[in-house]
């Protein structure tokens, strides 16, 4: 079993690096404002038709463009969900959503979280899924990538005030990265057996002679961007464990690759744009080390079996509860870590049925800020915050002004970095406390004791860090939970983007200082260790008390 797990992890990472390297080169061209070959004419026509100026923006203008687009998308999606019964492509005549569920869902998909307090096949029409949710899957992913584009430019430009043009970046990211790659993935999914139609639900006779209603819909097209954009919201309630979304072992492997593809490519692009590929490799090493350790822990925990079943004398050599037999324990464990290391949240197994330690690792990966590969764009700019913090700590230890890539890190940058890092832990801890203090929060718990608290902590961690996966034992479709989680998702997304853009605006105005004998190398194994230590230290100090009340207490009981 150990050899199979090692081979699975090694194969996954090898294929991932091979695919991400060329994509990283393409992203580097876009960051450097170099159009891809053959696209200049198309871009010129589109910019003219849309009235888009390619004049560069300062950080405030860039931020306002990103926020404006997302707020417009939020309003449109909210009213679309409220009135979906008036809109076309609704063969099942599904009614509009309640205001609190519509708000939660709209915020969820605009913030790239894709938390779902509903069952897709019984709640949303084809139009809502396709024109509402799928469109936001593209736009939220493009928004995250655009923010990291601006931050990377801040490190490479000197004595400037502009960071690029948000509209140009958003169009290029969508047209030349997200749409083509998602199209290829969708076609592969269709070839493998994923659904893509607009037929009404089909009544069929089962082998037992009973009738069953099979849901239909344009699944493959949404599934592709759901994974590529690290969105994670499933067309069906069972998400990627549903055979209509994820029919074969090949589609499952491609789904995992798609989740990590752009976050990995952005690390390669970062190295190319900064002129030092070792910087990108440093980030990849730090992410990969944490990732491999976490996968190993989850695999080990799940192959030990369920201790509660073992205590009752039942056969539980491995923990297969809540897992698809066609994928098994090892693949389910890998997928769980991939989807929570990135801000995806898609699942092929029920995380609520994992062992105490097996479920704690995905929860902790979210709590440290989704920086181990992370979401498209958001993962890298989240990790860059920890890089700045690590550089600052190292500067204090050696008595020098901290600097990174030649840019001095001053008080303003550190205040903004601390603010951005503290946003999500504050939301998680205060949100979980509020839920446990109120009857409306506690009444949603379907399990008592430490596991019930773990369900609450997982839900708030998932929402605040824009992941979207869940311990499904929590009944979250209530006004209290819909509003609480919507607030956490909104602030967790934009409460980090705003200080990140402010950091970019501050750094882009500075000159780059040449490296000296006293400059801390930020590309070697020493800094990789320092960066990993910073991530672990912040995560441990912040969440150990809460984790001790949940999964740790459950493991020890």
Swiss-Prot record:
It comes from the Bacteria. It is a multi-pass membrane protein. The chain crosses the membrane at residues 5-25, 63-83, 132-152, 170-190, 253-273, 283-303, 329-349, 356-376, 379-399, 416-436, 484-504, 526-546. Disulfide bonds: none annotated. Keywords: Cell inner membrane, Cell membrane, Ion transport, Membrane, Potassium, Potassium transport, Transmembrane, Transmembrane helix, Transport. Its main location: membrane. GO terms for molecular function: P-type potassium transmembrane transporter activity; potassium ion binding. GO terms for cellular component: plasma membrane. It is found in: Cell inner membrane. Belongs to the KdpA family. The system is composed of three essential subunits: KdpA, KdpB and KdpC. Part of the high-affinity ATP-driven potassium transport (or Kdp) system, which catalyzes the hydrolysis of ATP coupled with the electrogenic transport of potassium into the cytoplasm. This subunit binds the periplasmic potassium ions and delivers the ions to the membrane domain of KdpB through an intramembrane tunnel. This is Potassium-transporting ATPase potassium-binding subunit. The lineage of its organism: Bacteria, Pseudomonadati, Pseudomonadota, Gammaproteobacteria, Enterobacterales.
């Amino acid at each position: 079993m150990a050899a199979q797990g090692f081979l699975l992890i090694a194969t996954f990472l090898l294929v991932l690096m091979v695919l991400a390297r060329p994509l990283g080169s393409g992203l580097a061209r876009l960051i450097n404002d170099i159009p891809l070959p053959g696209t200049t004419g198309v871009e010129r026509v589109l910019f003219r038709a849309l009235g888009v100026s390619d004049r560069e923006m300062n950080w405030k203008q860039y931020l306002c463009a990103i926020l404006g687009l997302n707020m417009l998308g939020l309003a449109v999606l909210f009213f679309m969900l409220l009135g979906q019964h008036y809109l076309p492509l609704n063969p099942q005549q599904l009614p509009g959503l309640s205001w609190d569920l519509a708000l939660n869902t709209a915020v969820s998909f605009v913030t790239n979280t894709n938390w779902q307090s509903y069952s897709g096949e019984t709640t949303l029409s084809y139009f809502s899924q396709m024109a509402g949710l799928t469109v936001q899957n593209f736009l939220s992913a493009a928004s995250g990538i655009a923010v990291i584009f601006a931050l990377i430019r801040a490190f490479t430009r000197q004595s400037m005030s502009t960071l690029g043009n948000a509209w140009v970046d958003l169009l290029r990211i969508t047209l030349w990265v997200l749409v083509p790659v998602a199209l290829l993935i969708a076609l592969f999914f269709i070839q493998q057996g994923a659904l893509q139609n607009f037929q009404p639900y089909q009544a069929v006779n089962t082998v037992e002679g009973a009738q069953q209603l099979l849901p239909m819909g344009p699944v493959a097209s949404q599934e592709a961007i759901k994974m590529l954009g690290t969105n994670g919201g499933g067309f069906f309630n069972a998400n990627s464990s549903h055979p209509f979304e994820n029919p074969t072992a090949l589609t499952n492997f491609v789904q995992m690759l798609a989740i990590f593809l752009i976050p990995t490519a952005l690390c390669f692009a970062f190295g190319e744009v900064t002129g030092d590929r070792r910087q990108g490799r440093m980030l990849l090493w730090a992410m990969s080390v944490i990732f491999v350790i976490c996968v190993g822990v989850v695999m080990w925990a799940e192959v030990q079996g369920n201790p509660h079943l073992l205590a009752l004398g039942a056969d539980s050599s491995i923990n297969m509860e809540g897992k698809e037999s066609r994928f098994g324990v090892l693949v389910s464990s890998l997928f769980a870590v991939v989807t929570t290391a990135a801000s995806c949240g898609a699942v092929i197994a029920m995380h609520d049925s994992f062992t105490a330690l097996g479920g704690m690792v995905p929860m902790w990966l979210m709590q440290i800020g989704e920086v181990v590969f992370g979401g498209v764009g958001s993962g890298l700019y989240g990790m860059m915050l920890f890089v700045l913090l690590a550089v600052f700590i190292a500067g204090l230890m050696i008595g020098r002004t901290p600097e990174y890539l030649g840019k001095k890190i001053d008080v303003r940058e550190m205040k903004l970095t601390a603010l951005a890092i503290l946003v999500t832990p504050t939301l998680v801890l205060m949100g979980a406390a509020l839920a446990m203090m109120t009857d409306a929060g506690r009444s949603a718990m379907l399990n008592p004791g430490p596991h019930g608290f773990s369900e609450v902590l997982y839900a708030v961690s998932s929402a605040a860090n824009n992941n979207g996966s869940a311990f499904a034992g929590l009944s979250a479709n209530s006004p209290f939970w819909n509003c609480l989680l919507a607030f956490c998702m909104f602030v967790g997304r934009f409460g980090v983007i705003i200080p990140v853009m402010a950091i970019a605006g501050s750094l882009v105005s500075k000159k780059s200082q040449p490296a000296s004998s006293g400059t801390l190398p930020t590309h070697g194994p020493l800094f990789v260790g320092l960066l990993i230590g910073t991530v672990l230290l912040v995560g441990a100090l912040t969440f150990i008390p809460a984790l001790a009340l949940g999964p740790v207490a459950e493991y020890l009981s």
